Amino acid sequence: MDVQFLGGAREVGRSAILVNDSLLLDYGMLTGNPPQVPLDANPDAVVVSHGHLDHVGALPSLLSGDDRPPIHWTPPTRDLANTLARDTLKLHGGTLACPFTETDVHRMSEVSVTHGYGESFDAAGHEVTFYNAGHIPGSAHVLVEDSDTRLLYTGDFHVDDPDAGGVGGQRLVAGSRARPDADAVIVESTYSDVSHDPRGAVEERFAERVARTVWGGGTVVVPAFAIGRTQEILMVCDAYDIDCYVDGMGKDVTRSVLQYPGFLRDADALRRAKGHARFVTGRRGQKKRIADQNTVVVTTSGMLSGGPAMTYVPEIAGHPRNLVAFTGHQVEGTPGRELLDTGQAELDGQRTRVSARVDQYDFSAHADRDGVLEFLESYRDAAVLVNHGDRCVGFASELRENGRDARAPERGETVRV
């Protein structure tokens, strides 16, 4: 089996892997100005691991010509990919920064084929099976089989902590458990050098600080990714009796994933959390009034690169009793990272100094180092191809030192497994 890395090799973003010159796994986009896309591909079929921009962002561009390869995914992933594509059009449509058109996005629905977990199907002459990856609703490990080789593409994944009491993982989705036999594994390595704190401890620190801020007369803005993180934080707030508003794309995503209770750990808990939260429907004036209420606002974007956070954060920036509570990693070069590092950031075109307290809480939906190593324990004899990380080469070297057959391919490289 030949595996070519078109993107996501030795980097996080624009994931794309071509199997046997015919089956494409993911086709993502690396955010930036302009966004970066993988190397060109002309597949016979596409299989998608999950609905995050770095895995689906460039998908519509595959349909810009005469070819119409079928796109295989879970139902939640299909819906999330469409939401992201339309958001990209809203932000960049009609410019050179957008690699596709409204027509291309419409064509995705024409070639869409959905599958559940554990249901094998044919794609470009390969037998393919999805398994829950525990990352976001609908996320999948992808097992690809031809006549000679079984290849497991982990996609992004998260595992529960079996030793944790109470909250051992995400509230939104159950962790990855399936370990199908495979001859080769393409494994993500986003946090291959990081150990996450126990999820229960992170939740408690977050809830305590948020509640203390509100009791002290402050307002809390929680920048959160629309997909996965907004829903997770809603459930945490509900579990700790914290009232909150929700704004941004996360509102639509919450409604969307609730259509698929079988892809959630506890759909009733998310439904209850949604019912207790207040969804913001007004414009800038209402947002400013909410920011003055000493309340909690969960809003996009997670790294302060846009969205309603551009209104809320400047409104609360001037007083130290307020709080900006980041819930995810802040990538170098983003306003969120700048705010963490310097106490100021460019928000909506204005340089803003933030006197409010700024905290960060690790609600990661990726496996940490122990989680990745635990996963790979089931594949001692398999070839390991490390991707989706900033230190793929280093992690592959560590695996080889432990007797593994491991390597970190470069973008454009083809590996035979």
How would you describe each model-predicted region?
Residues 208-327:
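Hard-cation-handling environments
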Residues 152-154, 158-160, 188-196, 267-273, ...:
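Acidic/glycine-enriched edge-of-secondary-structure segments
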Residues 2-47, 52-56, 61-228, 232-233, ...:
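His/Asp/Glu-rich metal-coordinating catalytic cores
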Residues 34-35, 81-83, 162-164, 196, ...:
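Short, charged, surface-exposed secondary-structure boundary motifs
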Residues 71, 193-199, 223, 254, ...:
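Hydrophobic alpha-helical scaffolding
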Residues 1-5, 23, 38-42, 64, ...:
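Haloarchaeal acidic low-complexity proteome signature biased toward cell-envelope/secretome components but also
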Residues 11, 279-417:
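C-terminal regulatory/interaction regions
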Residues 77-79, 251-252, 329-332:
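Short beta-alpha junction loops
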